[in-house]
Regions:
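OB-fold and OB-like single-stranded nucleic-acid-recognition modules
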Residues: 2-14, 21-213
Length: 213
């Protein structure tokens, strides 16, 4: 099956894996000094955000089970993906709904709270077709990296296993770096990646981001 990009944030390939060593709500994440040398990434998990967050993705309801997919969606009919449980969802509050059999779906920008296991809505969903996402800052300043492509490929191959339990979504090499999309990061995973691979070799991007004040 082909894969469809489903958000303006350009989240690519993969699926969520939410279990294992995710930090419990309100707990302090372990520090990089607590992790084995070279194994910070995947040993550490960011604490859930205390404030509201925003994410863009596809909401899918299969027989009453509602999830939001912040990564890619298989271009089948109806679409398929593995996502994050979504609480407080009501289709009556949503525009742009499609359905096929017992499956309903739509693409939305969502505001809510994330507790490490589910997203709970705190605002009305906005269809992505009507949503103007804020520009994201490029942490590299547009400067290419210098890591050889062969090393980037090895790093990319490691990331799904290293980050699976901390919300890995996707990764790809570009401009001398590996770009990796995760469900949520407050800087913990970026610091861990810098510890393991060198500063700026791996760029971590969070699908959920703090809501505007």
């Amino acid at each position: 099956m082909r894969v469809l990009r489903i958000s303006a944030a350009a989240l690519l390939g993969g699926m969520l894996a939410l279990a294992g060593c995710a930090a419990s709500p309100g707990s302090a994440p372990p520090s990089s000094s607590d992790a084995p040398a070279g194994q910070s990434l995947g040993s550490l998990a960011p604490a859930p955000p205390e404030a509201e967050v925003v994410g863009e993705g596809t909401v899918i309801d299969v027989d009453g089970t509602v999830e939001v997919c912040l990564g890619p969606v298989a271009e089948s009919y109806p679409p398929q993906c593995s996502g994050l449980p979504l609480r407080g969802w009501a289709w009556d509050d949503a525009d742009g709904v499609e359905s096929s059999g017992s499956v309903r779906w739509g693409q939305y920008a969502l505001t809510g709270t994330y507790d490490g296991s589910a997203l709970t809505l705190t605002g009305a969903p906005v269809p992505l077709a009507l949503y103007d996402p804020p520009a994201r800052t490029d942490p590299t300043g547009g400067e290419p990296g210098s890591t050889p492509e062969s090393e980037l490929t090895v790093i990319q191959d490691e990331l799904p296993d290293r980050l699976g339990s901390t919300g890995y979504l996707a990764s790809y090499p570009e401009d001398g770096r590996v770009w990796v999309d995760v469900l949520w990061d407050d800087g913990t995973l970026q610091r861990a990646a810098d510890d393991d691979y060198g500063v700026g070799v791996v760029i971590v991007r969070s699908a959920l981001r703090p809501a505007a004040p």
